[in-house]
């Protein structure tokens, strides 16, 4: 973060990687080259790592060696969750943080003129993710050894890091401050007093003792004990039991919201909001749009009244330009502004992620412009937005794009491509062959039977939903245990299907897009690509290389493309696979390595998910029949399950259990 703050930032913390592995294959040269280039000041480079070569481990080694705060961006929440789990295992002693959109459900504010329908913003904020977002921003302001794993939501407006840091309340034993002054300070930074329901972002008061629950935690809180108008001592406590966990020499409490502004700035912001409203009202009236003029006046005056009274209003982010003191068109503050100037960015699956970063701005502006044109929002709401790609680029000090198939954009940014082709397991890229489409069903059935007899699994990728369904029906008739995975299947269900495939509940998985995250199955020895010669997103060079990679985790990996001609994309994908395979075979021969299928533990699919969903449903039925004591027991049990789900990053289930807890509490 740029600018001075009152926080003692620990600059000398070192990253410490914990792993039972040593770099092997071509990981050592990849790590060495990336590190040397970063230390030599190179701005951008690409880590072009084949599937299964241990790219995350290489990234971790680089982070440890360059020792800079690092932002890792993934293209969706699920992938970000997987990376967060891996980095947390590699760096147990450092701050590994998770920053994704905190909406479980999010319907953005919108207006549809054709049907005169205004859709109000409707969202449910996931409390666990909100905690993790606060944990990320506070860690960045307090220490140097921080890795933040984020989705593309990190380029959305977040509020000024300077206001956030300057609003922080700093407390030490011996400090002269009255209890009432502390209570006022806490309310100013959006903490709520609640002496009964003690949770994140709240505080309670008992005589000369104030207990405070920071927004970035969900288990331990802090107890501040006063002697007169002086802090006597500060202790960390267990929030549920109140048990003392030890004394604290310094406590920094960051605001309970990222959108902070001081009183002086608030007055200035309100003045500017009202001026902008008058201009907009006059413009609407001049155009004869009296409904729009009345609408924008009514809405703005209500919001301003809330800001004056509470310091906050729903949709406060739409006034962020005024709150931050930005000029029209200036980019908003984002998570990137919370980092120090010299930080490292790593873009995972960059061929997907960079496309997302490019597309965010236009989609956001189109929706908001409609709200402005019809008097639901002031024009300044257009400046509460994601960064444009060039604005994102201006934040880049040093960046590493990570992908098996880097996109054109990344290749234009740098000529430095560091390859990682050798797998630690000695596994080779699979053999690829092309077969004609005539008689492909019978041919495929024969191949499937040959694989399933050996206890191996098969992926089949089609181009259309109809073909996938027809093929599934045909294979079922032929006695094959098969499932079709379509795009409507939710993330959790997808994980369950993959687990069942690995366990042998069924043998063949058919899908249109088998490049989705988490679909890495070592038991798959055959990937069949139907209509391989139909050019398009999933049949271009990158799509084919990624699909071929799905067979690269098995020592008998084989790929069959069914096609009547060999397209340029097919040829390039086959040439690249053959090139890698040759390098891998030469390495194995030189080092006497025999390829070994990856031994990947089949984790008990978020073990609490199925049983708990059943239990939760059962509890729901019995709520009304419970007495008070039974309900208290049920609440404790559910809260434990909720924390377990959250720790496993199963936020959907955690939110579901949280709703059950709230329902139970409301019965008392």
UniProtKB/Swiss-Prot annotation:
Binding site for ATP: 49-56
GO molecular function, one term: excinuclease ABC activity
Tagged with keyword ATP-binding: yes
Record InterPro entries: Helicase/UvrB_N, Helicase_ATP-bd, Helicase_C-like, P-loop_NTPase, UVR_dom, UVR_dom_sf, UvrB, UvrB_inter
GO biological-process terms attached to the record: nucleotide-excision repair; SOS response
Signal peptide, first to last residue: none
Domain Helicase ATP-binding: 36-276
Subcellular location: Cytoplasm
Classification via Gene3D superfamilies: P-loop containing nucleotide triphosphate hydrolases, UVR domain
Pfam family, one: ResIII
Boundaries of every UVR domain copy: 632-667
Function: The UvrABC repair system catalyzes the recognition and processing of DNA lesions. A damage recognition complex composed of 2 UvrA and 2 UvrB subunits scans DNA for abnormalities. Upon binding of the UvrA(2)B(2) complex to a putative damaged site, the DNA wraps around one UvrB monomer. DNA wrap is dependent on ATP binding by UvrB and probably causes local melting of the DNA helix, facilitating insertion of UvrB beta-hairpin between the DNA strands. Then UvrB probes one DNA strand for the presence of a lesion.
Domain writeup: The beta-hairpin motif is involved in DNA binding.
Record family assignment: Belongs to the UvrB family.
Subunit comment: Forms a heterotetramer with UvrA during the search for lesions. Interacts with UvrC in an incision complex.
Name of the protein in question: UvrABC system protein B
Recorded name of the encoding gene: uvrB
